[in-house]
C-alpha cells in the first residue's frame, strides 16, 4: 500500500520549519523532544541491542517500538490459519511486553505500534510516511553476524529502507549494540545553512537568508511533487499487483476448498477408525476385567485349599500322636493279656469273658474292636452307626469328640480271638482230656 502526501501538507511542514530557522537553540530543543522509532523483529528479544543502543545514545525520552507482523498465507485452512494467527499474536504481545519492560527499567516512556503487512520493509516505509517519522533505529543485520570489521549493511530489509526511505528521516543502523552506519536526513543541513550566529545581523543578511530558505522551500516542494508522482506510479503498480494477488487468492480458495473436502473425508475416516478403536478397547478392557476376576477367584480357591491342607496336616499330626498313645496302651494291654491268658487257661469253661472284651454299646463280645477319639474301644460297626445317627459325643463320657476317626485295635482283636479259641477248646471234652 502506498501513501500519497499532499503538496499543501509539505508546504505547511516547511513553513513550520522556517519559523524556527533563525533560533538554533530552540530548534535543537524541539529535536530532542521528537519520538524515536525503533523497529523490532518477531523473534524473542532479537532486537534488544538496538533498543538499548537507541535509549543510551539518541538522547531521547520518548520511544515508539514498531512491530511489523507478516500475515499467515491465505492457502492454509481457516481453522489452522486462525490458530496460528492467535498463537503468533500472543507471541508478539509477550515479546512487546518484554521490550516495554526494558524501557521502564531504563526510565523512558514507550509505546507499541503493530503493523500487519506482507512486506516488513514496506510496512516500515508506510509508517514513516504516515507519521512523519524523523528518527528511526533498526538492525543492520542479526547480532550473530556482527564482527569488528563490519561497516556495511547485511540485512536486505535494512538495505531497502536505506535506499527507499524518505529523505526527511534520520536512520541509525545498529548490530549487537554497536552503530554500524547512519543515513542523515537531508533537510537537517539545508534548514540552518544561512542561519545567523549573532543578534547584530543586517537587514540585507536577513533578506538573503530568507531568500535562501525560500529556495530551499521550493526545492522541498519540487521534491514532494516528485515523490507524489513516484507514489502514483507505485500506486498503479500496486493496483496491478493487487489484481494478480486477488486472482491468486481466488485460485487459492478453490484449491483450499478441494483440500477442505479431502480434509473432511479424512476426518470422517478418522472418526470411524476412532470409533472402532474405542469398541476394541472396550472389549479388551472387558476381557482384562474378566481375567482379573478369574485370577482373584483362583487366588481365593488356592487360599482356601491351603487352609484346608493346613487343617488336614494338623489333624494328621493329631492322629499320629493319638496312634502313638494307642500303641503305648496296646503294649500295656498286651502285657495284661498275657497275664489274663495265664489266668484264664486254668479257669473253667463257664467263666465270663473279660470286661474289656465287651462293647460298651452292644454289650457283646467285640469281633472288630476300634478305638475312638475318647480312648475307649467299641465294636467297629456299632460305633460307626452311632456316628451315622448324628452323634458327635462319646458314648461313655458324653463329651464332644474332636473327630470321628477310628483306629482298629488289632491287639485286642487278637486277644479276643485267642480267648474265643481257648474257650472253644475248653468246651470240647476231648480237648479237656488232652489238657
Curated annotation (Swiss-Prot):
Keywords in alphabetical order: Coiled coil, Transferase, Ubl conjugation pathway
GO biological process: protein ubiquitination
Coiled coil (UniProt feature): 227-345
Listed InterPro entries: Rossmann-like_a/b/a_fold, U-box_ubiquitin_ligases, Ubox_domain, Znf_RING/FYVE/PHD
Source domain of life: Eukaryota
Molecular function via GO: ubiquitin-protein transferase activity
Disulfide bond sites: none
Pathway the protein contributes to: Protein modification; protein ubiquitination
Enzyme class: transferase
EC number of the protein: 2.3.2.27
Ranges where the U-box domain occurs: 352-426
Pfam families: U-box
Catalytic activity, reaction form: S-ubiquitinyl-[E2 ubiquitin-conjugating enzyme]-L-cysteine + [acceptor protein]-L-lysine = [E2 ubiquitin-conjugating enzyme]-L-cysteine + N(6)-ubiquitinyl-[acceptor protein]-L-lysine
Protein task: Functions as an E3 ubiquitin ligase.
Name listed for the protein in its UniProt record: U-box domain-containing protein 36
Protein's organism: Arabidopsis thaliana
Amino acid at each position: 500500500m502506498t501513501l500519497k502526501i499532499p503538496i499543501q501538507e509539505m508546504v505547511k511542514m516547511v513553513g513550520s520549519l522556517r519559523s524556527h530557522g533563525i533560533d538554533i537553540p530552540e530548534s535543537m530543543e524541539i529535536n530532542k523532544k521528537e519520538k524515536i522509532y525503533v523497529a523490532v523483529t518477531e523473534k524473542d528479544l532479537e532486537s534488544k541491542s538496538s533498543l538499548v543502543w537507541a535509549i543510551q545514545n539518541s538522547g531521547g525520552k520518548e520511544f515508539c517500538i514498531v512491530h511489523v507482523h507478516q500475515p499467515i498465507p491465505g492457502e492454509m485452512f481457516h481453522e489452522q490459519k486462525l490458530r496460528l494467527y492467535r498463537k503468533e499474536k500472543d507471541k508478539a504481545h509477550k515479546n512487546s511486553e518484554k521490550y516495554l519492560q526494558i524501557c521502564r527499567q531504563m526510565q523512558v516512556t514507550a509505546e507499541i505500534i503493530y503493523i500487519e503487512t506482507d512486506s516488513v520493509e514496506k510496512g516500515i516505509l508506510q509508517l514513516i510516511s504516515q507519521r512523519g517519522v524523523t528518527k528511526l533505529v533498526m538492525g543492520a543485520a542479526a547480532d550473530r553476524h556482527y564482527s569488528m570489521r563490519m561497516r556495511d549493511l547485511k540485512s536486505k530489509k535494512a538495505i531497502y529502507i536505506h535506499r527507499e526511505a524518505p529523505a526527511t528521516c534520520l536512520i541509525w543502523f545498529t548490530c549487537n549494540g554497536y552503530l554500524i552506519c547512519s543515513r542523515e536526513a537531508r533537510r537537517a543541513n539545508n534548514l540552518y545553512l544561512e542561519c545567523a550566529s549573532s543578534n547584530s545581523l543586517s537587514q540585507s543578511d536577513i533578506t538573503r537568508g530568507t531568500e535562501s530558505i525560500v529556495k530551499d522551500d521550493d526545492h522541498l516542494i519540487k521534491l514532494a511533487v516528485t515523490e507524489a508522482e513516484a507514489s502514483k506510479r507505485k500506486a498503479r503498480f500496486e493496483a496491478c499487483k493487487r489484481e494478480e494477488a486477488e486472482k491468486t487468492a481466488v485460485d487459492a480458495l478453490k484449491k483450499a476448498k478441494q483440500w477442505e473436502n479431502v480434509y473432511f473425508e479424512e476426518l470422517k475416516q478418522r472418526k470411524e477408525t476412532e470409533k472402532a478403536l474405542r469398541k476394541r478397547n472396550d472389549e479388551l478392557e472387558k476381557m482384562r476385567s474378566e481375567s482379573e476376576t478369574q485370577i482373584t477367584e483362583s487366588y481365593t480357591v488356592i487360599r482356601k485349599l491351603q487352609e484346608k491342607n493346613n487343617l488336614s496336616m494338623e489333624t494328621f499330626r493329631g492322629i499320629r500322636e493319638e496312634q502313638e498313645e494307642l500303641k503305648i496302651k496296646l503294649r500295656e494291654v498286651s502285657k495284661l493279656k498275657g497275664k489274663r491268658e495265664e489266668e484264664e487257661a486254668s479257669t473253667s469253661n463257664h467263666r465270663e469273658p473279660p470286661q474289656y472284651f465287651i462293647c460298651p454299646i452292644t454289650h457283646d463280645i467285640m469281633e472288630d474292636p476300634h478305638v475312638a477319639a475318647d480312648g475307649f474301644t467299641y465294636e467297629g460297626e456299632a460305633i460307626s452307626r452311632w456316628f451315622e445317627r448324628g452323634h458327635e459325643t462319646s458314648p461313655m463320657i458324653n463329651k464332644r469328640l474332636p473327630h470321628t476317626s477310628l483306629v482298629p485295635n488289632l491287639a485286642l482283636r487278637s486277644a479276643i480271638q485267642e480267648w474265643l479259641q481257648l474257650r472253644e477248646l475248653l468246651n470240647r471234652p476231648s480237648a479237656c482230656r488232652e489238657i
